[in-house]
Amino acid sequence: KYDKCVVVGHWPVCLYQKDINCMNAIFAVDKNVIAIDGGCALKIGAQLNALVIPQKNALMQECSVETYDDFPSLVASRNQEYQKATISIKYFDSEVKVLEEQDDIVFVQHVSSGVKFWEPQSYLYKNSNGVFSGDITDTWLEIHKGDIIKVIERTSKGMIVKKDGMLGWYQE
């Protein structure tokens, strides 16, 4: 824990959270740390997190965050129930095996966990060590008809979207 509030970047906030893929700033009050790196230019669904400090000697709890991304907005046309992720891939454990390909989407198996899931084909990359996935989750976000969501990518199996900084799937 730091004596004074420390603001950190460089390490995208989505990497601090194991089971979700969220780009929002993290206020770790118990450690006196605010992490603001939204993954710009590095992460799928990235956003700019700008820390707003209302006055010179403001307490950490008085600060807020404004976010920005340039993904297109969409008004949700239907309700969707939340389905918790069975996997949330991060770059440091992202090797996959392709099991099936369908147009713009692939069914893969995460090598270290054995979990099988669908993801956009465009999220895969290869190198001499194998086939790897970009950061992805199989979470289906809770979305209500009329919610404003951001469209990250459209696929034949649904859309990767962002709602309130959280990435996941939505079926229109």
Stretch-by-stretch model annotation:
Residues 1-172:
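Feature recognizes metal-dependent phosphohydrolase scaffolds
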